[in-house]
């Protein structure tokens, strides 16, 4: 059973946490999975801005992902 911990929606796409270290993008019209992204760190939050998904992981790590493709754009460690 899927435990939904975090969800963000933009432009007909829902990005949801599908495990502590994984997110999926779902097309809200069709219900089809668009992409899945896995990380090495526990995800604390998901947000979307300007067609970029931002994952906050382990307090200081921020991972930016393209909303349409699921490809990682950038990863930052905030000191």
Swiss-Prot record:
Keywords: Plasmid. This is Uncharacterized protein MJECL22. It comes from the Archaea. InterPro entries: Quinoprotein_ADH-like_sf, WD40/YVTN_repeat-like_dom_sf.
């Amino acid at each position: 059973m899927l435990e939904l911990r975090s969800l963000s929606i933009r432009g007909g796409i829902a990005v949801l946490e599908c495990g502590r270290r994984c997110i999926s993008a779902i097309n809200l019209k069709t219900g089809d999975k668009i992409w899945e992204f896995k990380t090495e760190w526990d995800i604390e939050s998901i947000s979307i801005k300007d067609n970029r998904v931002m994952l906050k992981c382990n307090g200081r790590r921020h991972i930016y992902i393209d909303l349409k493709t699921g490809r990682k754009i950038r990863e930052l460690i905030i000191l």
